[in-house]
Swiss-Prot record:
Binds 2 heme b groups non-covalently with two histidine residues as axial ligands. Binds one heme group covalently by a single cysteine link with no axial amino acid ligand. This heme was named heme ci. Its main location: plastid. Heme b 2 binds at H86, H187. Heme 1 (or BH or b566) is high-potential and absorbs at about 566 nm, and heme 2 (or BL or b562) is low-potential and absorbs at about 562 nm. Coiled coil: none annotated. PANTHER family: CYTOCHROME B (PTHR19271:SF16). This is Cytochrome b6. The lineage of its organism: Eukaryota, Viridiplantae, Streptophyta, Embryophyta, Tracheophyta. It is found in: Plastid, Chloroplast thylakoid membrane. Its cofactor is heme b; heme c.
Amino acid sequence: MSKVYDWFEERLEIQAIADDITSKYVPPHVNIFYCLGGITLTCFLVQVATGFAMTFYYRPTVTEAFASVQYIMTEANFGWLIRSVHRWSASMMVLMMILHVFRVYLTGGFKKPRELTWVTGVVLAVLTASFGVTGYSLPWDQVGYWAVKIVTGVPDAIPVIGSPLVELLRGSASVGQSTLTRFYSLHTFVLPLLTAVFMLMHFLMIRKQGISGPL
């Protein structure tokens, strides 16, 4: 085993990377409230795992979506547990994200030179809210349907570009299969990819600049 490790160490300098990760200076003022961002990340990873598991059973069609969710909850092995964890982890992610934003704002973590870290955090907050909007509609029950209809109808109040925006969101003039397909694609592919990219940027900047000092 040591020979295998030495082979990789010679080429990749694994020990140097490990030392850099584990030896980062942590300011003495850091407390449990500085863990809120990490908890948000953990919730996101739980969302990815449980969401991926549900894609094996969920059917993104207006005629089968609700029945497939019922199947997950009543027939699939541990489906009720996976969906419940997904749901509660989603709520926890939103709550931890809000508390994290408040902590950063109240401790001045958005000030120079960490403006870009704050910007990426704001983008992540918008993406988190978008997860909630798109995921809420996927069961395609009465609550999900009318939520989509209301949310996608909001841009209609914007002059000139309002109607085209509504049609872009819905995929057609009215809420239907095209809308569900778009929301499913956003929820399972586009938003997770964007979130992963911005999280990586966010953490790299934190890694480079370190944790902000006390006020």
